[in-house]
Amino acid sequence: MPYSYTEKKRIRKSFAKREDVQDVPFLLATQLQSYLTFLQADTPPSDRASEGLQAAFSSIFPIVSHNGMARLEFVSYVLGEPVFDVKECQQRGLTYASPLRAKVRLVLLDREVSKPTIKEVKEQEVYMGEIPLMTGTGSFVINGTERVIVSQLHRSPGVFFEHDRGKTHSSGKLLFSARVIPYRGSWLDFEFDPKDVLFFRVDRRRKMPVTILLKAIGMTPESILAHFFDFDNFELKSEGGMIEFVPERWKGEMARFDITGRDGNVIVEKDKRINAKHLRDMANANIQRVSVPEEFLYGRVLAKNIVDPDTGEVVAHANDEITESVLSALRAANVRDIQTLYTNDLDRGPYISQTLRTDETADQMAARVAIYRMMRPGEPPTEDAVEALFQRLFYSEETYDLSRVGRMKVNSRLGRGEDITGPMTLTNEDILETIKVLVELRNGRGQIDDIDHLGNRRVRCVGELAENQFRAGLVRVERAVKERLGQAETENLMPHDLINSKPISAAIKEFFGSSQLSQFMDQTNPLSEITHKRRVSALGPGGLTRERAGFEVRDVHPTHYGRVCPIETPEGPNIGLINSMALYARLNEYGFLETPYRKIIDGKVSDQIDYLSAIEESNYVIAQANAALDDEGRFVDDLVACREAGETMLTAPANVHYMDVAPSQIVSVAASLIPFLEHDDANRALMGANMQRQAVPCLRPEKPVVGTGVERTVAVDSGTTVQALRGGVVDHVDAERVVIRVNDDENVAGEVGVDIYNLIKYTRSNQNTNINQRPIVKRGDKVAKGDVLADGASTDLGELALGQNMLIAFMPWNGYNFEDSILISEKVVADDRYTSIHIEELTVVARDTKLGPEEITRDISNLAETQLNRLDDSGIVYIGAEVTADDVLVGKVTPKGETQLTPEEKLLRAIFGEKASDVKDTSLRVPSGMVGTVIDVQVFTREGIVRDKRAQSIIDDELRRYRQDLNDQLRIVENDQFDRIEKLLIGKTVNGGPRKLAKGATITKAYLADLDRWQWFDIRLADEPHAVVLEQAKESLEQKRHQFDLAFEEKRKKLTQGDELPPGVLKMIKVYLAVKRRLQPGDKMAGRHGNKGVVSRITPVEDMPHMADGTPADIVLNPLGVPSRMNVGQVLEVHLGWAAKGVGHRIADMLRDERTAQVKNVRAYLDKVYNTTGTGEQIDTLTDDEVMELAQNLKNGVPFATPVFDGATEEEIGKMLELAYPDEVAKRMQLTDSRTQAWLFDGRTGEKFERPVTVGYMHYLKLHHLVDDKMHARSTGPYSLVTQQPLGGKAQFGGQRFGEMEVWALEAYGAAYTLQEMLTVKSDDITGRTKVYENIVKGDHVIDAGMPESFNVLVKEIRSLALDMDLERN
């Protein structure tokens, strides 16, 4: 595969042992695909499949009026163009959505005619609300913020069988139950009680005997018994009787009487157990019937009603037990043949028969009435109501829907194959079969279902969740329409009079705005974005709750293999409930997770890839990805490690059906970014995966020297980099945009052959980190489709770069790295390695108040000129101003009501005039503890209010930028067109032209160069066809110009119209501050292996331990953090990183020395590096210039990839270390023989440490838990209303609570005065604290403590309990 534009600049050497059979699929495909099928916007209405919006509409329409004379039919829907694009919506705080219009048809029938005929039809497009659109990266912009809809893992619709594990009854008996779960509608449960009676319940209501349900669906006791039991046939004699002999029913039974053959010989003696030999003897004796004594019949249960043949009356009922009296009645009625139920204690229980005895209903109607009474207690059961309710429970498509998944699961579980034939409601057969399977389970046949099996849990994606909400909105609309349809005829209404779109908009808005599954996007870095979109949650509406979820649901299940990551899940209460999709996983049409496998054909592993769901997988034997294969693709070993039905085993190659696609198949994106994951303990790997998502983007991203090869995929798929949509040549590039002239073969005729990429500059993310894109192409570069043109936050040359490569030494250092603390060199801070930029958004609104409008102005009294000189004439801060806490950003004054004035104020007013007093200063100021630079200001003005100068200048800048884009496009299009025209004209004969060109002359290049290009069109060519081509070219150019003018005009209109602001708001101003955060003690840092710590000290570089050549370590970590945590991956990463940097230094040495800096030497060394181990790279396909550029980029480290579960071995690391540090270098640097440790020297004394230390490079991250965000101090601030104590927390500018235990501590020390001060004047003694403030101002430091307010609160509370408590003052 050829290298892409960015790949060949810095090739990552991979240690993978096997070639990739399949690339990692597009990581956001699930989200994008799901929403695409929901909208089907680009599909013509006639071709739309019945899913998403189409399905929702067709399930509700047509709506028929109560009298049936009018109906509203749905024809089609269309989605309009969104008014604002994504960026504009984010700036203005709007939702990125497009208007939905449905074409509906109102059909009125004629009342007068006997058979229904159509009187009139009205068709109209009706507005149905706005549907939010997904951005290209799988998120939604709702009210200006980016949100993600997380997929939900819920229990699949279908039928499930389980037991209570013996927990319900004290005896520990297993009580079996079955549950039919529809997609929407009532749940139907069946359950056994401890007495083996079978009950059913609907929607978890009161339970009733299951035979009531069977009678309600039209069965009689006889047919019920016939369905569930086999019969024994008896012939009654005057004494005793004859039973039909069925051998298998007698085996293992105890003989209760002598069984004799026809010849009178005893075959089985009384009280002997009947065995196989007895049965053979009986068969040989040709016994058809066995004579039984009278007692043998007692206790048996009749299978059918027995009717007296003469009178026709019922002598005995089905399900009656045979007693003496029943037998004598039967004999009296001359009945010879009877049938009884065949039951035994082992595997034919009499459960249904017992249930039938507890059931008192007589017939079908009575049964349905009983069900009605359970569902609607207290309502009178009329016949119609009873029928209607029963139909609506399980048989009506409006109220009950199994869905395609549910029907498929029901059919496959009840043994009808996996097709989805059958209605989407329940049928009587379904109910009967379910009960039958449940009885079989109780009889000991069959298996219960595993609820945590991924074949029984499915994923609801964005599209499906949105469709459910949309349907809910439509149902509300349907009710309103039904009522109004009756009037449609009389009042001559149109469809839009009937439909009110408010309920739909409300349902959609509620879902996207406040549903539990609609989450504020985690945008700390590209990885956290991508992980958030691939998350699968078991919580949410219709899912589990944290409190009720047990251990089993949270645990890793064998079916997670390749579908859900076993590592990445949060620590804490959500553990195991929130998961991440595995790298290669995808959803099938039913919403079940599938994972790819390579098919094995005739013993050879082929490249054919099949996706299997958890259910399908259980039928196959699947080999691991690391099984050894020969060149033909056959297994080398006699026994191969495989998985079958969740168990691991060794088996012969001939039995294997499939093989894993890749070793990284089982983990998620975040876990697949951890090198040497296979050497880390699972708990630490979990922390490592989670902490990568919290890494703050550094100022200068640096690629990890030790990666896994997934970095490029993540960076590109996350959408933070800019990819070329079409190939071409870079025409212009600057910090803000890249302009590309598209290749002719990729350009569609009639379209502009120019792509302009406007880069995102210094934009705030959801987590206040900085998003900024930097171009990495130069003018004249050729790029192909999909190449990376610009890096985003945390990406370096198109690869994910979350942290920095640091030189690590594992050694204790004066206790500064005790218990996971981290010692860092000052050089790291000085080089700005971990400096990050955070962007804060501060907003101020000017409202219309009762006393008049608030005003944004520079004219504020009592403000020093130093404060005002940052503001422009409109009272808004300049861009580029550096501000600190309490500086004014936007001047604002609010009118205040007239108050009683003190004499002094009256005097002042009399002297200085009115104006100064009737407004108060409510300006926007920088919050405490913040220092930064203003990088952007946005002004939003309500329609009808005059814009200030600042707002106008912002609009002018935006328009200038847009015009520049259009001019660039036009320039390139015109240049292309004129180049073609020039080729057409040169050498042609003319009839005349500008500058007195004579007839018959030929056109030369010099003549054309002399003319203005637009004059070329005035040349009259002699050749007619060419003249036509010239005319067409002129027309097309003029048309392009006209199109661009229209586009500019539209943009201008959009920008100059007033902004939509909340009611009562006149102006809104947003100021963006860029805050630079340097690394400091207290910041949290971590590696990728869960090795986290807090910076304890930043040490001068001269004090750090250094190597023999004087190189100081960047970070010193405690070696004791490794063994107990068992994350050895970090040590291997350090070794390999050490090799990577060493190889880079060797390349740098080669390039420095003129003798070795020739291309062939460089090629030879690179070949050694890239092609001694691993899969190898094609360095020889690169040109000499490309090889030298590659070498330049490799100078500070060759990037290595050690894929998960397929990484570098110890030998390979050793080989690389030898390449990196030849003997003379190793000697000079005082490395040990293994080259993994070095002798270090103490920076302060210069002495050698007493033993060598492991050194090397590790990719280390700075996490989003910064001490700046957490530190906070308060002098004076707000107090709580009731207790009058200071509030708590940084957000409230609160104090530090001096709690119960702290009071005890001071009591223990006897520090009475300190304690008094803490509990009174520093807390809630109101008069005392005011007095102290006065005293401090006067310079007199005296405390006058009084009564704390909380004591008064206590007294009041005691009084509220009607206990009169008073203070006695003396």
UniProtKB/Swiss-Prot annotation:
It is an enzyme of class 2 (transferase). Pfam families: RNA_pol_Rpb2_1, RNA_pol_Rpb2_2, RNA_pol_Rpb2_3, RNA_pol_Rpb2_45, RNA_pol_Rpb2_6, RNA_pol_Rpb2_7. One of its GO terms (cellular component) is DNA-directed RNA polymerase complex. One of its GO terms (molecular function) is DNA-directed RNA polymerase activity. The keyword Transferase applies. GO terms for biological process: DNA-templated transcription. Its EC number is 2.7.7.6. It catalyses: RNA(n) + a ribonucleoside 5'-triphosphate = RNA(n+1) + diphosphate. Keywords: DNA-directed RNA polymerase, Nucleotidyltransferase, Transcription, Transferase. PROSITE patterns: RNA_POL_BETA (PS01166). The RNAP catalytic core consists of 2 alpha, 1 beta, 1 beta' and 1 omega subunit. When a sigma factor is associated with the core the holoenzyme is formed, which can initiate transcription. Belongs to the RNA polymerase beta chain family. PANTHER family: DNA-DIRECTED RNA POLYMERASE I SUBUNIT 2. DNA-dependent RNA polymerase catalyzes the transcription of DNA into RNA using the four ribonucleoside triphosphates as substrates. This is DNA-directed RNA polymerase subunit beta. It comes from Bordetella petrii (strain ATCC BAA-461 / DSM 12804 / CCUG 43448). The lineage of its organism: Bacteria, Pseudomonadati, Pseudomonadota, Betaproteobacteria, Burkholderiales. The gene is rpoB.
